[in-house]
């Protein structure tokens, strides 16, 4: 079964950086412990305040349930995070393991 990688890339407002970093720590903890997701957050090298969230699902079926399995706390954290994103918005990408 091929794995699936789902990414969300965005830049945050510079004045929101400290709040964002505190929130993303809480979000990662919640999604990996409570939600049992394979989830990481990366900052682009050389591009301060540009981040990519990465979810790795072990199958297409698991990927299809990612959003359905977000509890109320995860939805609240995501909503707060969106307020830190700059006017460029979020860019989504889904890739499926080839081999």
At which residue positions do the language-model features occur?
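Absolute protein N-terminus
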Residues: 1-2, 99
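Short, low-order "capping/linker" segments at domain edges
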Residues: 91-99
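Generic structural motif
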Residues: 13-15, 58-60, 98-99
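Residue-level marker of intrinsically disordered, low-complexity segments enriched
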Residues: 2, 52, 75, 93-94
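Short, well-ordered beta-strand segments in beta-rich or mixed alpha/beta enzyme
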Residues: 4-10, 40-67
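An amphipathic, aromatic/His-enriched active-site/gating alpha helix that lines ligand/cofactor pockets
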Residues: 30-39, 56-91
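Short, surface-exposed ligand-recognition loops at beta-strand->loop->(often short) alpha-helix junctions
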Residues: 11-22
């Amino acid at each position: 079964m091929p794995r699936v990688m789902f990414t969300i890339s965005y830049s945050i407002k510079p004045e929101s950086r400290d709040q964002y970093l505190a929130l993303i720590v809480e979000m990662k903890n919640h999604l990996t412990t409570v939600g049992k997701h394979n989830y990481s957050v990366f900052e682009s090298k050389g591009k301060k305040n540009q981040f990519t969230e990465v979810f790795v699902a072990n199958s297409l079926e698991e990927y299809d349930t990612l959003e359905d399995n977000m509890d109320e706390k995860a939805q609240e954290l995501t909503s707060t995070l969106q307020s830190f994103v700059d006017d460029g918005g979020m860019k989504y990408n889904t890739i499926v393991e080839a081999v």
